[in-house]
């Protein structure tokens, strides 16, 4: 199973379920019921800052699975059929890789390195940034597209399909409906600005033709 395959499954799982990066990286197969297309989301894999090493002057951090701060962050979500198919194949591929590996640290994790250890969140960021640089994707303001923007995209797609804001709030597990509304409003304004810029270009070309 190639690294590119693992990243692709991770990105599409985050997008399809509106997950946070840490939530996806902490997923375990026991949290996923593929037969009934249901997933239990809650903990988050994070790198915690350690104590300062007096000799080196550096802090030794550690990876840890952190429980959600709010009750709404723990939830059972329905899995889109496309993501179910993706995860089924990923499970088969991972099992084959695990059998071929000399060492495999944790057979329960959904997303791992080539030796079964948790994926470092910073490495996920690096892989995502490399993909965006390769295909030339940026945000309208010129800044980098973040992994977290996949979550925002999920909200926008759901709204575009006619899903009500309260349901989207439950899917993204926001504690406040206002948070969900603010994200969608911000993204809508960006889309409207791009549309206005496109119209401005069209009008300019029309003006030159009309002269």
Regions found by a protein language model. Give the residues of each.
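Short, basic (Lys/Arg/His-rich) helix/loop patches that form interaction surfaces
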Residues: 1-8, 17, 77, 92-102, ...
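C-terminal secondary-structure termini that scaffold catalytic or DNA-interacting sites
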Residues: 36, 43-83, 96, 103, ...
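Residue-level signal for well-ordered alpha-helical positions
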Residues: 27, 90-93
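Basic, Lys/Arg- and aromatic-enriched nucleic-acid-binding interface segment
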Residues: 1-27, 35, 46, 70-74, ...
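A short, basic/aromatic helix-end/turn motif that makes direct DNA contacts
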Residues: 26-32, 169-175, 183-186
């Amino acid at each position: 199973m190639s690294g590119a395959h693992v990243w692709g499954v991770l990105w599409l799982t985050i997008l399809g379920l509106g997950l946070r990066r840490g939530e996806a990286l902490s997923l375990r197969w026991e949290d996923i019921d593929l037969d009934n297309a249901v997933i239990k989301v809650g903990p988050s894999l994070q790198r915690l800052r350690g104590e300062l090493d007096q000799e080196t002057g550096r802090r030794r951090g550690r990876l840890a699975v952190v429980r959600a701060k709010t009750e709404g962050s723990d939830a059972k979500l329905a899995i889109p059929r496309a993501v179910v198919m993706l995860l089924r194949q990923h499970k088969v591929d991972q099992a084959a890789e695990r059998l071929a590996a000399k060492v495999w640290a944790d057979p329960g994790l959904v997303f791992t390195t080539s030796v079964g250890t948790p994926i470092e969140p910073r490495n996920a960021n690096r892989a995502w940034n490399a993909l965006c640089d390769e295909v030339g994707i940026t945000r309208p303001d010129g800044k980098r597209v973040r992994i977290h923007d996949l979550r925002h995209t999920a909200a926008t797609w759901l709204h575009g399909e006619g899903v009500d804001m309260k349901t989207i709030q439950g899917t993204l597990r926001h504690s406040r409906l206002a948070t969900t509304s603010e994200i969608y409003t911000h993204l809508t304004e960006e889309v409207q600005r791009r549309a206005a810029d496109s119209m401005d270009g069209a009008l300019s070309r029309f003006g030159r033709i009309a002269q």
